[in-house]
Amino acid sequence: NTPLLASRRCGFPPADYANLITVGFGMLSIGIAESAMDAYATAARKSKGGAPSQAENQWVQMETGMLWTQLQAARLFAERVAWLADERSEEAMPAAAESKMLANEVAKQAAAEALRVGGGGSFLLSSPIQRIFRDAQAGALMAYSVPLTQQVVGEAVLAAD
C-alpha cells in the first residue's frame, strides 16, 4: 500500500543482504570527523595578535598526528564494512556496529580537540565548530548507540573461545 508506482518498486532486499543503513552509519561519523579535522587545522593555523599559531605547538602537532591516524583507521574499517556487505558476508553487520562505534568516538574526539584549539570563540553560533561538536555527539546517540555497541562487542569478545 504505497503511492510509489509499481514500476519504481524494487522490493525487499534478500534475507542474506546486510542492512545498508547500518553499513553507512560509520561513514556518517567519518564525514563529521573530517569536518572537525578541517576546523581544527584552520583554528590551529590562525595567528592571534601577532603570536605564533597553535600549529607550532608540540602538543597540537602530536594531537593532530594521532587524530589523523585514528581517522584513517576508522575510514579503512568503514570501507571494509562496505566490502563485506557487498560480499554478503555474515561478518558485515557485526563489523558495521564496530565501525560505527569507532567512527563515532573519533568524531567526538576530533570535535572536542577542535573546541580546545579554537578556544571560547568555538562556542559562538558563527563558528562551524559548535555545530560540528553537536553533530559528533548526536552520531554517538543514534541507533545503535555507542554504549550499547560497546556492551555487545565486549560481550562477544569475552564469550569467544
Please tell me what each predicted stretch does.
Residues 48-54, 89-93, 126:
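Flexible, glycine/charged-enriched surface loops at secondary-structure junctions
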Residues 120-161:
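Glycine-rich phosphate/cofactor-binding loops in nucleotide/flavin-utilizing enzymes
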Residues 24, 38, 101-111, 124:
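Structured catalytic cores of enzymes that bind and process phosphorylated ligands/cofactors
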Residues 26, 57, 64-67, 92, ...:
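Hydrophobic packing residues in well-ordered alpha-helices of helical domains and bundles
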Residues 72-102, 115-123:
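C-terminal helix-coil-helix/basic helical segment that borders enzyme active sites and/or dimer interfaces
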Residues 1-71:
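Glycine-rich beta->alpha junctions and the first turn(s) of the following alpha-helix
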Residues 31, 65, 69-72, 97, ...:
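Generic structural signal for well-ordered, non-transmembrane alpha-helical segments
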Residues 42, 74-77, 108-109:
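Extended, amphipathic, non-transmembrane alpha-helical segments
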